[in-house]
Amino acid sequence: MKLSSACAIALLAAQAAGASIKHRINGFTLTEHSDPAKRELLQKYVTWDDKSLFINGERIMIFSGEFHPFRLPVKELQLDIFQKVKALGFNCVSFYVDWALVEGEPGEYRADGIFDLEPFFDAASEAGIYLLARPGPYINAESSGGGFPGWLQRVNGTLRSSDKAYLDATDNYVSHVAATIAKYQITNGGPIILYQPENEYTSGCCGVEFPDPVYMQYVEDQARNAGVVIPLINNDASASGNNAPGTGKGAVDIYGHDSYPLGFDCANPTVWPSGDLPTNFRTLHLEQSPTTPYAIVEFQGGSYDPWGGPGFAACSELLNNEFERVSYKNDFSFQIAIMNLYMIFGGTNWGNLGYPNGYTSYDYGSAVTESRNITREKYSELKLLGNFAKVSPGYLTASPGNLTTSGYADTTDLTVTPLLGNSTGSFFVVRHSDYSSEESTSYKLRLPTSASSVTIPQLGGTLTLNGRDSKIHVTDYNVSGTNIIYSTAEVFTWKKFADGKVLVLYGGAGEHHELAISTKSNVTVIEGSESGISSKQTSSSVVVGWDVSTTRRIIQVGDLKILLLDRNSAYNYWVPQLATDGTSPGFSTPEKVASSIIVKAGYLVRTAYLKGSGLYLTADFNATTSVEVIGVPSTAKNLFINGDKTSHTVDKNGIWSATVDYNAPDISLPSLKDLDWKYVDTLPEIQSSYDDSLWPAADLKQTKNTLRSLTTPTSLYSSDYGFHTGYLLYRGHFTATGNESTFAIDTQGGSAFGSSVWLNGTYLGSWTGLYANSDYNATYNLPQLQAGKTYVITVVINNMGLEENWTVGEDLMKTPRGILNFLLAGRPSSAISWKLTGNLGGEDYEDKVRGPLNEGGLYAERQGFHQPEPPSQDWKSSSPLEGLSEAGIGFYSASFDLDLPKGWDVPLFLNIGNSTTPSPYRVQVYVNGYQYAKYISNIGPQTSFPVPEGILNYRGTNWLAVTLWALDSAGGKLESLELSYTTPVLTALGEVESVDQPKYKKRKGAY
C-alpha cells in the first residue's frame, strides 16, 4: 500500500514531533509509529519496508526453519542440519536457547561445551544460513518449564511480568546470552539478523496487567543493553496485534505471529478440519502492522505428540507434503515475507529437558527426521517451494488481492488469490474452495497478462487441480530478460548461464500444462519425445502445451532451455550456490543466488564450489545415482564428487553426467542382550541398613512457591530444596503406635508420572500412570505395625518435567513436584519427619558437562554409575532382559565396541521391545552418560530411540546404563534391547567428534 507524498510528509512530521497518528485508508485503520527512536535504526545492515526485509540494501524474503541446538548437542551434526536447510532453498534458521540448561544454579551462567552457542553460530555461517535468535527467557518449546530453570518456582513474583523479583532473576541469563548473540550479529560479520525478546506473549489472566508495556520494554532493553542492535521481532501466538509497532512502550520493530492451522490431532492424520485454513491474515496484517513486512514466526511444520500418542510417523502423515502445498502456498497468498516453519528438525528431548506432556523423541513429524534423514516427501516438497521463492523476487513487490471463486477460474470449486505485479510479474495462488477436498477438479483460467487477458489453456484441454493440492501460476515472470507471459506449470528454479538460460518447470502426474513466452523464436524439443507436446507461434509469442511425463523433456526457445518435469523427478534436483572463493556457499544474496548451478543428484547436494579447473560437489547418496550438472562454468574441466575425481561425459546440451556407485558397507552391530551386563540394586533405600543421614531434611515450614499453599506441616515440594529434574525419593520416618492401618498420599510428577511406596522393605503399591494424570491420590493398606518401633516410608516419584508457563498470571511453571499431601491413619501429619533427594547436589549439580537436567535422584545416578567405566567389577552379573522378580529399581551397566566405516552416515537406534507382559515398568537408558531414552511400558508410544554419532562413539568403546523400575509386585523385565540401523548414507559430512564423555569418578559426598 502506497501513501501519497503529502500524507507521508505529514506522517513523518508527526513522528518527528513524537505524536501518534491514526488514519483510515480503504477501510483499514493504520497506526504510524510514534517513537522516533524506534525508527532511527541502530544499524544499517538489516532494514525493512512494508514488503520485506533488506539485508545490506538488498530485498530478501526470509524462508526459515526452526532448529534447537540443545536438542542436537553434537556440533558437526548441527552443520549437517544447516546444510540440509540450505539445500531446501531456505536462507534462515530460527533457534531457541533453553535457559534451564545454562543457569541451573542461580547466578552461574554456564554455556560451554555442548551448551556453547558459538559453534552453532559458526556452523550457520559456514552453511550460509542467517539466524533469528529467540533466547527467551521464556521459550515454551515443549521444554521443561518452558525453558525456565526450576529455581524460578521460588521467585516471589509473577513470572513473565514486571514484578521486580522475576525481572531480577532474568538479568544474569539475558545479559550473558544476549551479549553472545550481539557478538554474532550481522553488524559484526555474524549470521544473526533478527532478535525475539519474548515468546508468544499473547495471553494473560488472574488480575495481572496484560499486555504489560513496562515488562515488554524491560526485556527489550535487556537485549539492547547487552549490545543487540538488530531489529526486534515478536511472535504473537495468534494474529492479535500485541506489541505491534505503534502500540507504544514495549512495541517491537517488526510484528509477527504464529499459526498452527491443522492442529495436533495426529491420531486422525487424514482429517483436515473444516474451515481451519486461514483466509484473513492479510486483512489482519494491514490492520495491525501495515508498515512492516508480513511475518509468521512460527508456522506449522509438524506437531507435538503426547505420552500414549500415536507416534510421530502419524504426525508426519498429518502434516505431510499435501498440507505443505495447500497451507504454505496459502501463506504466500498473503505475501508472507518472513516465514519460519516450526519445526524443520525437531531432535531429541535427551536428559530430561522435555516438558511433562512429551516423551524422549522431539521428531515433531518435521521435514528432517530425528535421525537427520530427509526421505520424507515433505522435505522434497519444501525444496520445490523454497527454490521457487529464492528466484522470484517479483513476489515481494506484487500487490496481494482478495481471494475469489469467480473472475479467474471457471469453477467455484476453486479459489484464486492474485498477487498482481507492476512489471515485476504476477502470481495466482489456486486451491480448492474446500481446502480439504480430495477431489480432482478440471478448470480453465482467465488471467491478465502484459499481452492481453487470456483464457488458458489456449491450445485445448483443461488444467487439473488434484485433491489437497495448490498451485502458484505465474504471469509476466522474468527469467533474466525473457518474459514468461504465463505458466500453469510451477516454477522450480531458473538460471542465466554464460551460454544461455535454463528454466525448470514441474507438474503433477497426469496433468496438462501450458506456457507462453514473449519471443519470435520457434520451439525445438532437444531432449526426450515430442509426443504430448504441442506449440503455436504468434507474431510476438509462442505457446507450448504438454502432458506431464515421468520422462524428462527439454525444449529450446531462443536462448532459453526449459526442463519439463513431473513433480517426483523435480524432487531429485538441487540448486547449490556456486562458491568461487573458498568452499562455503555464503549467504543467499542476489549475487550468490544468481551464481547457482542446477544439479540432479538424488538424496542430497550440500555444496558446490570451483577450485582451479575443478568443479567440486559435496553430496550424499543412499543408492547408485546418476549425477547431472547444468550450467557448469567454462573454466571447469574436471568433476570432483566428495573430493574424488569423477569421470564425466558432456552431452550436446552441455550437461555434465556422471555416476556415483553406492555399495552399502557391512554394518556389524553388537548383540546387546549378550553383553557382559552388571547389576546393582538402585533402591537400597528400602533396606533396613540404609542410612539417610546425609540426605537433605524436608523441614521448611513454609514454601517459597506462590502458586500452591502447603497442605503438609513442612514443604515436600522438591524445588524448595533445589531438585528440579528426574527421579525424586522421599523417606518418611515415624514411630508406630500400632494403630496405623492405611497410608494415603497425593503425589505429583506431571503427565504420565508414576510413583511407588514401600514401608521399610514391604512393598505397598504403585501408581503406574496415565497421560491424563499429573497427580494422583492413593491409599495403601499397612501391615500390622509394632508399637514403639521406628518405620520408614520410602516414596519414589518421577518428575516428568516442569509445566510450561504459556498464560501470564497462571504461573503454571510453579506447579510443584513431589508430595502434595499425606495421611497416616490415626496419626497427625507431624508424626512423620521427611527427608528427600533428587540429583546429587540439586542446583549445585555434579556433572557440569552434561548439564543440570541430565540425571535424577536414583542411587546409581547420585553415585555417577551411569557414566562410562563405573566400578562394576564386583557387581552381580545380571541383564535388564532378566529384570526384577519383584517391585523395585535395578541398575544395569555394560560396554560394547563399534567399528563403523568412515565416510558413511549410519543412523543408529536403541530399540526396546514392546512389552507383552501386564507388569508395568519404566526404563531410562544412558549412552556414555547421556540419558537418551525414557520408556514407559504401559503408556508408550516410543520404543525406538535414535542416538546420534558423537553421543555414540562410532569407532570406539561405548557404555550403556539402564535403570529398570518395576511398579508391580511381579517385577518386570525388558522384552528385548537391540541396536539397529537404517540405510547407510554415503556422506560428504566430515568427521564427527564425540562430545565430552567424562568417566565415572567417585563423587565426594554422594549418598
From Swiss-Prot:
GO terms for biological process: polysaccharide catabolic process. This is Probable beta-galactosidase A. The keyword Disulfide bond applies. It holds the Pfam family BetaGal_dom3. GO terms for cellular component: extracellular region. Disulfide bonds join C205-C206, C266-C315. It catalyses: Hydrolysis of terminal non-reducing beta-D-galactose residues in beta-D-galactosides. Residues 862-881 are annotated as: Disordered. Residues 1-18 form the signal peptide. Keywords: Carbohydrate metabolism, Disulfide bond, Glycoprotein, Glycosidase, Hydrolase, Polysaccharide degradation, Secreted, Signal. SUPFAM superfamilies: (Trans)glycosidases (SSF51445), Beta-galactosidase LacA, domain 3 (SSF117100), Galactose-binding domain-like (SSF49785), Glycosyl hydrolase domain (SSF51011). The active site is at E200 (proton donor), E298 (nucleophile). PROSITE patterns: GLYCOSYL_HYDROL_F35. Belongs to the glycosyl hydrolase 35 family.
